[in-house]
UniProtKB/Swiss-Prot annotation:
Gene3D superfamilies: YggU-like. It comes from Actinobacillus pleuropneumoniae serotype 7 (strain AP76). This is UPF0235 protein APP7_1431. GO terms for cellular component: cytoplasm. Coiled coil: none annotated. Belongs to the UPF0235 family.
Length: 97
C-alpha cells in the first residue's frame, strides 16, 4: 500500500503516516519506508498528539478536523487516516499521488 492514496468512492485521500511527536515544528518531513513522515510539536500524552495531528491536517487540506477519520493506530506512531473531500492538497502530498 502506498503512503498516499486517492480514493474515488467516497472521494478523499488515505494517508499512511509515521508520526514524530515532540518535534521542534509541525511539518511534513517526507517518506519513511512506505509511510509519510509527519513531525508535530505535541507530546504523545493523553491523545494530545492525535488531536494536534488532526488539527494540522485539517489546516493543510482545508477541511473540518471532525471530518478526518483516524482509521488505524490511535495508540501507535504508525497511523492510517482518511481525509474526505479535501479542498486543497499540499504540494508535498500531491507529489506522491
Amino acid at each position: 500500500m502506498e503512503a498516499v492514496e486517492r480514493i474515488e468512492n467516497p472521494y478523499g485521500i488515505r494517508l499512511r503516516i509515521f508520526l514524530q511527536p515532540k518535534a521542534s515544528r509541525d511539518q511534513i518531513v517526507g517518506l519513511h519506508d512506505s509511510e509519510l513522515k509527519i513531525a508535530i510539536t505535541a507530546p504523545p500524552v493523553d491523545g494530545a498528539a492525535n488531536a494536534h495531528l488532526l488539527k494540522y491536517l485539517s489546516k493543510l487540506f482545508k477541511v473540518p478536523k471532525s471530518s478526518i477519520v483516524l482509521e488505524k493506530g490511535e495508540l501507535q506512531r504508525h497511523k492510517q487516516l482518511f481525509v474526505p473531500e479535501p479542498k486543497l492538497i499540499p504540494k508535498e502530498i500531491e507529489a506522491l499521488l
